[in-house]
A protein has these predicted regions:
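Secretory/organelle targeting and membrane-embedding segments
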Residues: 1-194
């Protein structure tokens, strides 16, 4: 099972929503790309309404390093380094490294963070960017027909035979069942927020 659908408790009381609606307000999935370059690399996606934060980010979690022979404890196993690209709110990037502290055998987390607005000023909003590109005839930010068809090929089986909608509490990160998707991969990560 690689797909979880959820609906926040209280959604059915929203004006205009059918009393027995099975429309999801949350989804989480684990995807694989079927080629040699990405073989064995999982891609996790989750999105939803009434979550604790409104944030869009891409997080690359690198392979966890093996236990190092010269550490204070033979059982010490550093966590994975991560690169986070925050798209919204306030675009930025963060490199989160595990490094050995000077004159010590202990590891600590080091964050190299950059808020793009601090460096280059506030840019246009994503909608302003898309509208400007559309008016200029720039197709780079828009999906072509082959990408749209491939997306439908991937999601159509989920639409044809969807799993049940699982209720989740407002202000949480979705149904607990979604945690099973990331089991063995370090779990879901909280978003990088300032």
């Amino acid at each position: 099972k690689h797909y979880v659908r959820g609906q926040y408790e209280g959604y059915l009381q929203v004006p205009g929503v059918a009393a027995k609606s099975t429309t999801e307000t949350y989804c989480a999935m684990r995807l694989q790309i079927d080629n040699w370059r990405w073989h064995g690399v999982p891609f996790f996606i989750r999105a939803g309404k009434s979550l604790p934060e409104r944030v869009t980010e891409v997080r690359v979690v690198f392979h966890r390093p093996p236990p190092l022979p010269l550490t204070a404890s033979r059982n010490e196993h550093p966590r994975s380094n991560e690169m986070v690209i925050r798209i919204d709110p306030s675009p930025g990037a963060s490199l989160q490294l595990v490094a050995k502290a000077a004159k010590s055998h202990n590891y600590r987390n080091i964050h190299l963070d950059m808020d793009f607005a601090d460096e280059g000023g506030e840019g246009p909003t994503p909608y302003e960017e898309l509208l400007s590109a559309a008016m200029a005839g720039d197709k780079d930010n828009f999906a072509d027909q082959s990408a749209v068809e491939e997306t439908w090929r991937i999601v159509q089986p989920l639409l044809d035979d969807p799993p049940p909608v699982i209720p989740y509490a407002e202000g949480t990160w979705g149904p607990a069942e979604a945690d099973a998707l990331t089991r063995g991969y370090g779990g879901w990560h909280l978003p990088w927020l300032d």
